[in-house]
Amino acid sequence: MNKRKILVPLGDKSYEVTLEAGILNNISEELLKIGITKNRKILVISNEEISNLYGEKFLNNLKDNKFQAKMVLIKAGESYKNLKTLSEIYDVAFEFGLDRNSIIIALGGGIVGDVSGFAAATWLRGIEYIQIPTTLLSMVDSSVGGKTGVNHPKGKNLIGAFNQPKAVFIDPETLKSLPKREFSAGMAEVIKYGVIRDKELFKYLEIEKNKNELINLKNEYLIKIINSSIKTKSHIVSQDEHENGVRAILNYGHSFGHVIENLCGYGKFLHGEAISIGMNIAGKIAIEKGLWSKEELERQKILLESYDLPTEIPKINKEDVLTILMGDKKVRDGKMRFILPKEIGAVDIYDDVEDSLFLKFFS
Amino acid sequence: MNKRKILVPLGDKSYEVTLEAGILNNISEELLKIGITKNRKILVISNEEISNLYGEKFLNNLKDNKFQAKMVLIKAGESYKNLKTLSEIYDVAFEFGLDRNSIIIALGGGIVGDVSGFAAATWLRGIEYIQIPTTLLSMVDSSVGGKTGVNHPKGKNLIGAFNQPKAVFIDPETLKSLPKREFSAGMAEVIKYGVIRDKELFKYLEIEKNKNELINLKNEYLIKIINSSIKTKSHIVSQDEHENGVRAILNYGHSFGHVIENLCGYGKFLHGEAISIGMNIAGKIAIEKGLWSKEELERQKILLESYDLPTEIPKINKEDVLTILMGDKKVRDGKMRFILPKEIGAVDIYDDVEDSLFLKFFS
């Protein structure tokens, strides 16, 4: 079966993720299926690169089917994920006459998705939106779960909202135009799901044949791992939408990932690459605390590296590490919380990690 | 009894409005009662005028009780209810170290409340906040119901979120420092509740003695009408939080009110004054459609005027009226919807009002 559907069960905010090669070419049909009627205005938010690849065809498909659609492009890059870009979207929304019954579609990677979802959360106090992620990272992570927002000059994602999409459509075909390095970065999050909850996925990724087929972007294999990743994410998010508890485990590798992104300058490492290094650090801490086995830490390292991900910790000043960690919004009541593995497929949340325990890994 | 509590029943978002003269002097006690522990940071958002009157005492009460509190002032006036002011609040939030467990308190009128509620909705994807309205308008209207947001250069409240407060505290004593004209403007919303749902309140307001006591700001009388107003609002909001149906009746008088605010220049009429004129226009349309009696329209006019509110329609170009009405976000699928009275205490929503029917009232 080439089409997969994954339910994200969140009461009256539940929605489905539809995963199918080529789905982008039949977008109007999919919209009609989920009850988007043709009298509703659609604002498609994308960026130049994605728009050059799929924009015209996508928009034409909507217009040929009598949808009243318009596309607005935002600049690519983390530095444009800010209030100014949001403000530009509001201007277009006003000019286009986006009303309470209209809908926003995010067509692009994580930045497009996050900004679009937040625009939808806040235009006229909230209108519906749909995620169509085009990068591996956004397919397995940000497009599902409703975290939306923009950056504050002092920190990533400080401004935002929990806002679940009405639907998510994923077309693995779009990965064929994704730079190899970004594909690898997305694999870091896939491997993360393996470590935190899905031993079978981890083992699947270790198998040489699967690895080759994935790197060659075979749809069947891509669908398998995307499906598994989203299933895990859906399961966790449905238990704890607003990250008051278990959802935090999705941040495995992220605290140190943010440290690395911040201190090495945004852009040196891609998000997924920083997460890969962060997972390695978290693993080392777990060893120090006697939680995990060295053999499994080594398996994690080998798997990350086999998908061309970095694991070596860059040179970073210890004091800077502490400053960033303390400023991280995952701190609660002044206590730093870390997600540490106990075995492949199981992690837990710890707030009793001594600074000295992780600072030794930095120079 | 001098203390009133009104429940706003919204499932796990339910909260209480506490109404008591002098409650501002015991704010720490009230916070502790609703479970705000002293380790939580509190950012108080206010404006200069309110801060000059109550700010120091308020902050000292918090600090004397070992709360970690800070106050930030925003500029008064509709033109500062924008993304830039919001951005300044985010900067203070960052510097103060506002975390997920922190809380925002809005101390002031409707603008302070709307901006604060939206800041709370969007800082770290949402933290808790408390409304302490200090104007009659915000006590009976904007502090309850969770509508928060800022203006877009092209229109009021286009950017925002539904975000219910954790609690609302109302101290009628603060009305003693409110300019007479603003008190009257607030009375327009109180009278509105009479017309849309509460015939008893309407009759109460008509009684000469009550009117005099209200104008003299007698707490007992103020508490009576604020309590009645909030009860009606609470009842309606709990049926339809996101204004997909019945909540729209709270906008009685507002469509034409917005037209008047827009076209006469913001500032010429206060919001409540524009609503008063809007209610008179809505009443006239109801007469034209044969829904309402001329006697009751006259009673509405006399009541509004007896609280020093304007009812006469200013000179406005017909075409401009249409432009503003069509741009109003209450338009759904291109249809204009009007709230029209059938009798004092009962209104309904109509989407079949011919343009000619109301344009005749404009010159």
UniProtKB/Swiss-Prot annotation, chains A, B:
It is an enzyme of class 4 (lyase). GO terms for biological process: amino acid biosynthetic process; aromatic amino acid family biosynthetic process; chorismate biosynthetic process. Its EC number is 4.2.3.4. InterPro entries: Dehydroquinate_synthase, DHQ_synth_AroB, DHQ_synth_fam, DHQS/DOIS_N, DHQS_C. One of its GO terms (cellular component) is cytoplasm. HAMAP family: DHQ_synthase. This is 3-dehydroquinate synthase. It comes from Prochlorococcus marinus (strain MIT 9301).
